[in-house]
């Protein structure tokens, strides 16, 4: 009998910064052990938002760029472009499996994959904020109930999947990939000169990051965020550094808003510069999903300025404080965090499900182990 040495052909689909960052180490092992086809959908594509991260993290050029957002007039239009483009790509590439991470529109590429009976592996499965106003919450439920193998980060996310009727044998908890990513790039992060470049004194400035649709597109929420930013600058008399996402910049361009003189807007930074900036800030105020993991792993004080969130495991350790969009809650949070030590002796333990050094190897082995399982048990394909 002749041994089949053909590598598994896996297609991974990304379209935003968080996906690129979280999958950076996984791309490396897939390139080594599989026939890996890397696809960028073009969901968010310009140098600041994407290419700078490919360069910074030394990720190879994608095999395909789909440009789904070009001339798109609506979210529905973008999603339609995605499904059509990805389906045509599947016909060309003929992958053995697809890997997606998270809850972006790009992850909806699982829909044509399902129709073509391609085994689907979903990282970050099971995250729930239980708020239908959050567009990602809708995507999460669609992706989770289409995917074949679910790879949640936490035990809580695993329980959510079970309660929604997902079979236990199709759920494998892997932990967050961010510990592996941050530790791999930590030497480069520490070498960053971003604080001196921006003329900032360590622990004497704030970092603010806001980009979520429910915060920016709502005038009520956006005005609350503006008030928070100005009040922090006014009361602390310290620089407030804001890395501007295109959605945020677009909103700022439409409205003539007066900001405090201590508020500084900068273009989006590369991964290593931005993480360094967060590590040396007095406090980070953010509506990002990643802030819970980053603040827990790297031990810096952070406030989550959202009304809902999807990482309760972070709250169990107090890794980040949820303060919503009310000024009084923000300032109470800042007062509590002012004594948080950044030294090696932690005040707050790292979240257990984030303290995982080998997620990339886990994912590689799970994909190799479960492609045949999906083909046999889901699609009844018998060789």
Predicted ranges, named:
Residues 8-14, 19-29, 33, 53, ...:
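Active-site and donor-binding regions of nucleotide-sugar-utilizing enzymes
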Residues 32-62, 68:
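N-terminal glycine-rich anion-binding loop in soluble enzyme alpha/beta folds
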Residues 43-46, 51, 190-280, 381:
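Donor-nucleotide binding loops and adjacent catalytic segments primarily
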Residues 43-48, 69, 146-221, 323:
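A nucleotide-sugar donor-handling region in carbohydrate enzymes
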Residues 100-101, 107-110, 122-123, 150, ...:
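A donor-sugar binding/catalytic signature common to diverse glycosyltransferases
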Residues 339-383:
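C-terminal amphipathic helix plus adjacent low-complexity
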């Amino acid at each position: 009998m002749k041994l089949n040495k053909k590598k598994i052909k896996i297609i991974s689909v990304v379209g935003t910064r968080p996906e690129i960052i979280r999958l950076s180490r996984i791309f490396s092992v897939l390139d080594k052990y599989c026939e890996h086809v890397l696809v960028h959908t073009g969901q968010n594509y310009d140098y600041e938002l994407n290419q700078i991260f490919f360069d910074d993290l030394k990720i190879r050029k994608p095999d395909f760029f789909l440009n789904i957002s070009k001339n798109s007039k609506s979210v529905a239009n973008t999603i339609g472009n995605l499904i059509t483009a990805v389906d045509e790509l599947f016909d060309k590439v003929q992958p053995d499996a697809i890997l997606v991470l998270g809850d972006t529109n790009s992850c909806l590429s699982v829909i044509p994959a399902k129709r073509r009976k391609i085994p689907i592996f979903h990282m970050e499965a099971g995250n729930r904020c239980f708020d239908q106003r959050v567009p990602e919450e809708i995507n999460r439920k669609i992706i989770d109930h289409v995917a074949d193998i679910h790879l949640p980060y936490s035990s809580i996310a695993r329980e959510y999947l079970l309660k929604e009727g997902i079979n236990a044998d199709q759920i494998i908890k892997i932990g967050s990939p961010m510990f592996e990513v941050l530790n791999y790039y930590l030497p480069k992060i520490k070498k960053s000169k971003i604080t001196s470049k921006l003329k900032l004194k360590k622990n004497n400035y704030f970092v603010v990051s806001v980009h979520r649709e429910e915060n920016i597109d709502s005038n009520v929420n956006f005005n609350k965020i503006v008030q928070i930013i100005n009040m922090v600058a006014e009361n602390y008399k310290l620089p407030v550094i804001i890395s501007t996402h295109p959605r945020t910049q677009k909103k700022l361009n439409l409205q003539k808003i007066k900001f405090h003189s201590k508020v500084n807007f900068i273009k989006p930074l590369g991964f290593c510069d931005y993480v360094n900036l967060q590590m040396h800030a007095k406090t980070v105020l953010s509506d990002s999903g990643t802030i819970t993991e980053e603040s827990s792993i790297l031990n810096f004080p952070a406030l989550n300025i959202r009304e809902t969130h999807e990482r309760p495991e972070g709250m169990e350790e107090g890794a980040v404080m949820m303060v919503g969009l009310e000024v009084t809650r923000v300032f109470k949070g800042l007062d509590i965090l002012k004594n948080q030590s950044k030294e090696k002796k932690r005040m707050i333990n790292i979240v257990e499900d984030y303290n995982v050094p080998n997620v990339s190897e886990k994912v590689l082995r799970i994909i190799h182990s479960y492609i045949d399982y999906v083909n046999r048990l889901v699609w009844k394909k018998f060789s």
